[in-house]
Amino acid sequence: MNTQILEIRKSLKKKLDPFRFEHTLGVAYTCQALAMRYEYDLHKAEIAGLLHDCAKRFDNETMLLKCQKREIPMSDGELRDPSLLHAKLGAWYAREKYGIDDQEILTAIECHTTGKTDMTMLDKILYVADYIEPGRYKAAELPQMRKLAFIDLDLACLSIMESILKYLESTNCPIDMTTVEACEDMRRVVEAKRAAEQAAAQTAVSLDSNISSSEMDTATPNKEVNKVESVKRNGKNRRSRIRGEKRRRH
């Protein structure tokens, strides 16, 4: 563990309540696990996981005031539900207070609550890790989501987004349009991947069929040759038997 990670952990342990700190460690751990599975940078994944909730120690009113003071853009959905602002404010703290200048990490932190269109690998890793980390127990369909996350990250993202939207609709909670747009975009990604896989499978079947047909075409002339040779051998054998019978008669 390098010095940067140690310093971040030390700071967060002081600033976050015990529950939030344990959640943070769980997300960082899961980010690393997903990064190993999908061959992504483990260090960047861990930092994103550690800092994703660094601003969640503030109440909604404080976050709203801090975002206004720092001129952080806020959507209508975030104004209706200021709890969402911890993502954008967290990205600001990650940059200004923790010295993170990697834009990919900052963007992943900024969109980890709502998602966004055109999500990067790190965006998806953090989004999914936040939902499935070991300390979670109330989220819907957790066992299935945890398994799916290590099989198909895009499909896991889509499934989580759909589950969250379904929950928000059923409880009449405000829905940020960013999440709706992110879900629609991820659905297109998943459908495009399925179409490509089906096309590849059909191509493979077609190639196998062509190879089999070619082998049959090659085998047919050989069968004809063998048939002719067999007829010739049978003819010779028959003539030999006739000559033998004639000699015995004489």
Pin down the residues of each PLM region.
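A short, charge-rich alpha-helical start-of-domain segment used by transcription regulators
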Residues: P18-R20
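Long, low-complexity, intrinsically disordered segments
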Residues: S214, A219-H250
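Charged phosphate-binding loop/patch that engages nucleotide di/tri-phosphates or the phosphate backbone
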Residues: Y167-I211, E215, E224, V228
